[in-house]
């Protein structure tokens, strides 16, 4: 079984709408706090579908885990790492639990979480999640 898993996650999701253009939803704490519950639920469902495609067939190591998120934004515009990474983490952790990839997202299962700035990537803005087991 693997002791290290790396998955690439989006920084935004697009929420489909019937009569208007799809809504861009940034996965950050501001939106997590302020979005309407209907919008939030749609974003969560879409993120779960994305995570499901990414981790299909991946066997996760046994817990406890250390999660490290490395953020690669699209532009050099300043952003708050503590606003972006926890939003992505919340959506991802919930999806991994719902998909049965990890048992829970409490402190006994995920014992450490780290956030890093990885540099600008105009071609592929993303958050890379490195899941390691605690030895």
State where each predicted segment sits.
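Catalytic phosphate/metal-binding cores of nucleic-acid and nucleotide-processing enzymes, i.e., regions
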Residues: 1-135
């Amino acid at each position: 079984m693997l002791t290290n898993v790396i998955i690439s996650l989006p920084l935004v999701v697009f929420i489909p709408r019937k009569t208007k253009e799809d809504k861009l939803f940034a996965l950050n704490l501001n939106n997590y706090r302020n979005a309407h519950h209907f919008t939030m639920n749609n974003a969560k469902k879409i993120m779960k579908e994305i995570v499901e495609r990414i981790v299909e067939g991946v066997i996760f190591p046994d817990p406890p885990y250390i999660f490290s998120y490395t953020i690669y934004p699209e532009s050099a515009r300043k952003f708050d790492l503590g606003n972006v990474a926890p939003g992505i983490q919340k959506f991802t952790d919930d999806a991994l639990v719902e998909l049965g990839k990890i048992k829970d997202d409490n402190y006994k299962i995920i014992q450490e979480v780290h956030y890093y700035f990885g540099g600008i990537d105009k071609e592929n803005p993303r958050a890379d999640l490195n899941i390691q087991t605690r030895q």
